[in-house]
């Protein structure tokens, strides 16, 4: 049976009905009467008696003539008596009460008329939505057929009859103090009015199917069926078959009561046929009906009592009183399913009344509802529909079928005018893209329908400039939350994108908040970018601004260059440019750029400077085909400045206040738009300033798209024969074939309309130009950065990451150039900003393009140990941490020696001409310091608050660059960089800072710091000094890639020169010749340059050695004794050795030399030595010439005192030298020891040495004479300081050498007990130090 498609139109507006409040004034009050006291009641009578008595007295006394003055006093008493009697009488007169009562009753009469008018409107509205069943026959084919949609308030509400209902308007009486005081007649009239008018009788009342899952109906069978027919008639008249389905199970299916259902399209089973056409959900067996409905019921969720717009509602009627519904699958409530069961079993007395499963009884023309314990009136006059009337209605509806595009994308307001129907698209899943993108006339370009007007006509949105007949170029849209602003924006975008290729239109969607709907357009070929969530990622807002400025500049330059080429002068607008193309000039097309700035007021709140940007782009964009649609929830005139003045068309959706509505569309209509989801997308369009607002509703495009259903089955009869049309299924004849194609066309998963269209458009035509590059959000692997940079090897340039330049619409490599003035670099960043990782990238990138002989790195790791991962790289000479002070000092020693060596070679700078590197094996050398703050706080004390090595770093920064020595540092604070160093750091990169106020990056005229836009959660992201965002590449240091091993494999046998360390045991032969001349002994190796340390006793004959036990004091004495003895004779050298602990007892001395361990021998030995040395002074009386030629005769005498702190410095208490101190004879000779041939060497413990230097006369004199001092290992906490230097825990034989120079020197003393020839700096040798 073929049917006509019924095209539903906009629903007719029902009669208006108010649901406000009528406030009724309270009745008048009567004052309360309080009885007076006995005295007050008696006092007037007493005064009257007094007056009469006075008059009698006057007459009795003979005063015949009474003067007025005499009568004054009685008159006053009379007035007082009257006042006492009437003054406090609060009783109202009867006339006053009657008058107020009459006024109030007249007032109630007016109120009654108003209430009746409201009640009449309510009844008329109810009768409009729910007319009498007898009127339903006239509805089919009219505009009202199938008028209800899921968003209508009366959707699935079926009229059951007439009943007394509450008045929709609230009646409220003003508060009164107490009802006792009210005037009784007025009060009674008010109560009567309220009791009568608060309800309306005989009003159509319905049953909401969305709120009930099962209805059980009892009563006489004929009446019950008549009632159910009325319900079904109401349902099928007002509801489209796509939103409502009807199913019936009845024993007498072919009888008059139910046979008429077969004509209704609501009972058809989609995709199934029988011998007569569409199969029907009609059966004589409830179980068979359940089997037919099985696929429909299977996936439905449980019943919740809430509307289910996405599901087709099923009304299932089971007319079988004997069927046990509770034991069937229909007993379980399902969403979008209502089961009506005709039952014969009355509920038992204690049965609970379930509001979701009501039990109704039809009796005496009324309907009662079961409440726990008994029946209660439900419908006063139940509707009944005869079988003939139902058959007549069904036959009238049978000729119509629903529009297949009804479901899904058709809203209640636009009705059949969906997105596809407005654009003339039959099936959005099979678009004819070439036809949609076909060239248009200029007046039709950028002109698309986006909804329907209040009269049902398509609303055309014309984006062109008003000079070309459009509404543009710029517009303003305001709509509060829930107004459908996003829905309207998506409708505009989808209409434009579907009908225009990327050669004619490109789009930038900028959403400051980050709505999910914007992402739906990300894959469209015309969409340049969807920029969302700019509130959290402030850098995106900056990129958006730069992109707009850059596109304006790009189009301006393109018009200028093309105009000069074509006509000799620049084109003034894109229109002139297109005219040149039409004239035959070969020019690339310039598409219109449509910018949607959603939530732009929030953007201006955070970035007020962008108001000038929008104003600039809006003014320039008119000629350059850059159109902007500003959208927001509210309008803050103070923030948007002149933006609204640059807009031509206005769109006002539901707004929060009348004032905002007036600002947008000129009237308050946008404020009066009703709230609720059924009114989303309703608004007013003002196409030009001063134009009349046009009410419209945008199409809904964000729903699931269901393609038009094609016939799934075909009936082919070999010999056509007429058949009787019955309600039950009709089996086909043997010669009839039903071909089912369900399996040939599997159903695709549900997809939204936007995604369905976007996928098809992406396969056609060109894509939009890449005006917006992806932001620096994704990690850049170092391998990718190397490939993109295109830097060749041996150029001493390498990429570090990428710089984002949205204004130029490109991303450039961040390249370090070692040969430029920016050869020194500082990376400034806060905690966890990626500083250490940036250094890893720096080193690995350089190593990937250069050999270890071309670049080498020496690292000081104060940043957490990340540089330690590169210590095995062939290009890395050393990685030293804060726990390796010796390696740090040696690193500076190596670099300073390298600098000195290169300074002495004049040809070093000439290497740049041919790209050659110096032949010293280092190449370009980089000192890398991770965390300058930690480095500057290391090796400090209370007198030196900063690391002394900082001065050496500054020297390398300012001098080393010219000699191929570079300094790369990171710091958490720019203040940690010394002033003298800052100018030498040519490349400054700033990562995320803890406080943006510490940033050194500034933009002239900007209201905020660029550092505010650097993301918090992206290490490696930062700014150049030009305020350009960059991102360091990731070094890819993982077990799988292992770049260190891969790079080392490319340079086998090559490595950067390592940092040489002092040996832990220094053999005598490792330093060459030990005796360099008279009194010149090599005692060790210097840390600074690993050169031999020569002890020149001729220049300074005094030597102090301090150190704790087994630090090497005695070993040094042993070396000195052996070296001097092996290179001298007894006539030239003599020794006096004081050795309390017998450590030097086995060292052979010359004959007659003094060796003593006895304390008693010290004083005579010192006296004898003093006499010997005193005798070497020149005799008295010599002339000046004789003195100049005079020298003493004799040997050089070495006085060696081991452990001088063990020798008591107190006077002798007994013996021949009583009162004599041991060192007193010697102290006077120390100042001239060098001239008199005396060499004094003393050793002592480190602990307490600082105290001894102040208390011991001998050591104090040594210190005064600036004796050479060696500080071996000692406890820094207990040993104090010597000449400002503190002891340190050093290995055996390691000492700090203090001379008359400015800085101390670390040395390794020779161990004469080591037999090996030489010990390398990294190898531990066996040997002992004592």
Curated annotation (Swiss-Prot):
Q: Where in the cell is it found?
A: Cell inner membrane
Q: Organism's domain of life?
A: Bacteria
Q: State one Pfam family annotation.
A: FtsK_SpoIIIE
Cellular component aspect of the GO annotation: plasma membrane
> Which InterPro entries does the entry mention?
AAA+_ATPase, EccCa-like_Actinobacteria, EccCb-like_Actinobacteria, FtsK/SpoIIIE/SftA, FtsK_dom, P-loop_NTPase
Q: Does the keyword Nucleotide-binding apply?
A: yes
Looking at the UniProt entry, the stretches that span the membrane are 43-63, 65-85
Please list the residues that bind ATP. 479-486, 829-836, 1107-1114
Q: How does the record say this protein sits in the membrane?
A: Multi-pass membrane protein
Q: Does the keyword Manganese apply?
A: no
**SMART domains per UniProt:** AAA
Q: Which GO terms describe its molecular function?
A: ATP binding; ATP hydrolysis activity; DNA binding
- What keywords were assigned to this record? ATP-binding, Cell inner membrane, Cell membrane, Membrane, Nucleotide-binding, Repeat, Transmembrane, Transmembrane helix, Transport
The residue ranges of the FtsK domain are: 456-662, 811-1000, 1090-1280
Record NCBIfam families: T7SS_EccC_a, T7SS_EccC_b
Q: What does this protein do?
A: Part of the ESX-3 specialized secretion system, which is important for iron and zinc uptake or homeostasis.
Its subunit composition reads:
Part of the ESX-3 / type VII secretion system (T7SS), which is composed of cytosolic and membrane components. The ESX-3 membrane complex is composed of EccB3, EccC3, EccD3 and EccE3.
* Protein name, as recorded: ESX-3 secretion system protein EccC3
Q: Encoded by which gene?
A: eccC3
